[in-house]
């Protein structure tokens, strides 16, 4: 597949820069929609409206496993609240998107993930919601969800100390030094580490 070919091309860079930089491959399986449309490989892997989610999860998991075997770390956006149960053990970095950063449920899921999780600023460029999400995800949470075998369970998390803000723009770009300083100041004000 094209994804595996890309991972093969990326692998030498992972090895070359391993002392100074963590290189990972962006592998997104879910597509947030403002209204309607194709929601991604997990939801509709055949691109035909059949919504064969079981196959989508299997394909996603196999792809992540194959990428890991090549020595390449994978990063993905966690959109659906249940799919992390099936793929999170193969994900080295996660993102919570601009449309879901304010969601209490996504903050709770992030608090239990075993990888660093970045929260994107809002679609309007609002940084505070991302900072608040990082602050919420570092704490333990308790919530109802489903286990891998489909049983209802109460989950308890210990918090995720590796949360961070993703500057993704909004009404205008926000990757300049002033925007980074503003994000750092908001993190400090919230009692969080502004590290890069």
Segments predicted by a language model, with ranges:
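Short acidic catalytic loops
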Residues: 1, 193-196
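Active-site-facing alpha/beta catalytic cores
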Residues: 7-184, 189, 195
């Amino acid at each position: 597949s094209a994804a595996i070919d890309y991972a093969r091309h990326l692998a030498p860079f992972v090895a070359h820069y391993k002392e100074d930089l963590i290189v990972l491959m962006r592998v997104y399986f879910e597509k947030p929609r403002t209204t309607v449309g194709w929601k991604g490989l997990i939801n509709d892997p055949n691109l035909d409206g059949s919504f064969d989610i079981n196959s989508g999860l299997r394909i996603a998991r196999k792809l992540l496993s194959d990428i890991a075997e090549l020595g390449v770390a994978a990063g993905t956006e966690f959109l659906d609240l249940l799919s992390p149960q099936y793929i999170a053990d193969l994900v080295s970095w996660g993102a919570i998107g601009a449309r879901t950063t304010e969601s209490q449920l996504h903050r709770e899921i992030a608090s239990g993930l075993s990888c660093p999780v970045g929260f994107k600023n809002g679609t309007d460029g609002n940084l505070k919601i991302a900072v608040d999400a990082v602050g919420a995800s570092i704490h333990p949470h308790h919530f109802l969800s489903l286990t891998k075998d489909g049983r209802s369970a109460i989950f308890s998390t210990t918090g995720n100390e590796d949360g961070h803000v993703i500057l993704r723009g909004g009404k205008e770009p926000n990757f300049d030094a002033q925007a980074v300083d503003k994000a750092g100041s908001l993190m400090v004000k919230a009692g969080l580490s502004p590290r890069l």
